Amino acid sequence: MAIVGGAALAIAGSLMQGCLGNPLVSPLTLGVASGAALGAALAIVLEFSIVSNSELAIVANAFLFSLIVVGVIIQLGNFRSVSAESYILVGIAITFIAGAIVSTMQYFATDAQLSQLAHWSFGCLL
């Protein structure tokens, strides 16, 4: 599973770099990873989830929120003709906004929730 996940991230990064013509573009700089972290934090701290199965709640939320970020970026391109630099700047803004929200949730989280959030954000496969 780890190999498939790593390969998917590599392909996603390569596609983003090719589409925007910038070798510095990645899921991190476009805010996709931060959107996923926000979704996971919502599932862990606020227990808000789009699915009722508690084992899939974190993953489903992370996936949904990363798709929301991708949708925002795609809509930016449909809105008007924008440069690759604008995509990157919007992605960086999304990264900081999502990071601020996650940090606020960490402040109000219990010790068990903090532990689970840290465990997930470090890349746990379980």
Indicate where each model-derived feature is located:
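Alpha-helical transmembrane segments in inner-membrane proteins
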Residues: M1-L126
